[in-house]
Amino acid sequence: IGAAILILCVIYTTSKVKEMPPKEYAEYHNLNSEKKEESVGWITLLKKAPATFWKVGLVQFFSWFAFMYMWTYTNGTVAANCWGVDMLAHNATSTIGYQEAGNWVGVLFAVQSIGSVVWAIVLPQFKSRKMAYALSLLIGAAGFIMTAFIHDQYMMFVPFVLIGCAWAAILAMPFTFVTNALEGYGHMG
């Protein structure tokens, strides 16, 4: 149903929204239509990228590692810590405990999503974006660490709410940093 609604919205929008030709757009906005942008390759753009791009890229690189590992190993971690499954056993993934833990991981990911939505509402309240981003990543790191030490399935909600805080910042803040670091016209779109 959701996909059908999305497709209908896209069809409606593309059929109803008419774009101005470039010359008419330039006249309407009092732009010099004769000015041509120089076309540069992506390697040149990377060489001229602001330092913020590289800093954020490095942080994102390591942040995404954490989430890739989480998506891969959460079932086993929750099964071992909360259901007592011996993950070194050859049949660990076929045990009832592992299956129940796998089901519970779905609940934990839902809790993470809720934490992410709530934190996304809080993020704009910070005066410093860098502080908000750093704090979010530290809160998320605390959540990741806590998962190794919690042995109650309901207490696992706490680290996953914290991980959700990091997730909200990882998705929103880098785009803000990089777009604000771009200078001039023609870098976007």
Labelled PLM ranges:
Residues 1-69:
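Intracellular loop-helix junctions on the cytosolic face of multi-pass helical membrane proteins
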Residues 55-56, 154-160:
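Short hydrophobic/alpha-helical segments at membrane-entry points of transmembrane helices
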Residues 55-59, 63-91:
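Helix-loop boundary and gating motifs at the non-cytosolic
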Residues 82-113, 155-158:
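Loop-to-transmembrane helix entry
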Residues 102, 184-189:
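Loop-to-transmembrane helix entry/capping segments in MFS-fold secondary transporters
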Residues 116-130:
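Helix-to-loop junctions at the C-terminal end of transmembrane segments
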Residues 138-151:
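C-terminal ends and interior cores of transmembrane alpha-helices
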Residues 169-186:
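Intracellular juxtamembrane helix-capping segments at the cytosolic ends
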